[in-house]
A protein has these predicted regions:
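His/acidic metal-ligating clusters that form di-metal
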Residues: 2-84, 150-158
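Conserved beta-sheet core of the metallophosphoesterase superfamily
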Residues: 47, 52-141, 147-151
């Protein structure tokens, strides 16, 4: 997308007939395999997508500039040693589980803002958007990404 390289892997249990979560051992194995595979790659994606937040956090910091995950239904943006970990939260509102809770789960999403700097797309900010009450209200939280390169950047020009 506009020169942005995106790669990812499906949820380990996406093809399973029953909605069971993957075991911690399976998640750790997936992370180990991904670390080994991508550490040897000649070209890395700018954004790496995967379902489970546990696997995302087990990816070596600095391997990918941006890792986007979910599964926990808890929105978060965290910078660790050269990687921005983004949990989009609940873009699907937890499916049927969204109707089985006492408190409604808000829909949420993460909107990423990039700016081209010296021919490279650089993440400048992440908007975490939360929609509640069947679309009757929303809130937005903007997280600015710390780079030595983005000091003095006019945030009105980010896209």
């Amino acid at each position: 997308v506009a020169g942005l390289k995106i790669a990812g892997v499906p949820d380990l249990v996406a093809g399973e007939p029953l909605p069971e979560s993957a075991s911690l051992a399976d998640l750790n194995n997936q992370a180990r395999e991904l670390n080994g595979l991508w550490e040897k790659a000649e070209e890395l994606p700018d954004v790496f997508l995967l379902h489970n937040h546990r696997t995302a956090r087990a990816l070596r910091p600095g391997l990918f500039p941006i890792v986007v995950c979910g599964h926990s239904h808890r929105s978060a943006v965290e910078q660790v040693e050269g990687t921005v970990y983004i949990n989009a939260g609940t873009t699907g509102a937890a499916g049927i589980r969204g109707f089985q809770t006492n408190e409604p789960l808000p829909y949420s999403l993460a909107l990423l803002y990039f700016q081209e700097i010296d021919g490279e797309l650089v993440l400048q900010a992440v908007d975490s958007v939360f929609i509640t009450g069947l679309g009757t209200s929303f809130s937005l939280q903007r997280t600015f990404i710390e780079h030595s390169r983005n000091r003095g950047v006019n945030v009105e020009n980010i896209r």
